[in-house]
Amino acid sequence: MQLAPALPGVFGQEAQRQRDFFVTEVTRLAGVPLSSLKLGYQPTQLAYLAQGLASFDAHGTKKLSPATKQALNLMLASQSDDGSFRNVPCWPPLESSEYHGATVAAHALSLAPGYLSQVGQEQVDAVARLKHYLQTAEPLHDYARVLLLWAASHWDGLISDSQKRDIIKMILSHQKEDGGWSMRTFATPETWAAGVRSAKLIAEPEFKTQPSDGHQTGLVIMVLRDAGVEADHPAIQSGIRWLKSNQRVSGRWWTRSLNTDKSHFITYSGTFYPLMALQKCGELQHDHLDPPR
């Protein structure tokens, strides 16, 4: 949803179908009263839709589309007074906190070609509130700090170089001996989504060992690359080796859900993030891919 436009040679026509769905959802949400739009997870939903559409523009026409502008305007209109974007702490890590929603909104704004030069004072003020929130709110856990670094890698001046170095150091300290990273080491059971899944997480058979997973290993390598860490850095190379050694015959990389052991939907991002990580390290060969950065 966020990153597929960067791999058009992989997704082909499916990417266009995805964009059509985003546009339909934005059109639907545009008909919702603003007072209702600010409730539940809809502000973060709008941030994801806006980021997805902005990504299509950034990797495609390089121009801001009317649909993306509408999505961004709606997203900013749904913003909370403190600058965050409301979310529901029910399905971590992606539906986890207002802080998470704010980092997605920051991505959307930084990706959208020319949007910030076209906005009025209302949007300018909303962007300033978002920046202030991300600069002053304390991240809930190390997973949130990873997201902050990711957003800051595309938004100049969001955090200081010293803060970036500290987060990179933190990320490297989480690397497992096998070269991968585990999502579960980046937050305690009590801090994922206000602790709504703590009993499930503590009861997991791997609670004490917390093995590496595709979601976190792929995410971390993507973020480190976007933050300027070279692909030949020993930690990244160890992570790449883990990815190459742990893909399943089905094509996916396994990630256990933080929420349920019936449907492991996190395996979708747990497979897509590794693809992006490999691409950003020059390890994924396919026609029409954007060059690694």
Can you annotate each of these PLM segments?
Residues 1-293:
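Preference for long, amphipathic alpha-helical scaffolds in soluble/luminal domains
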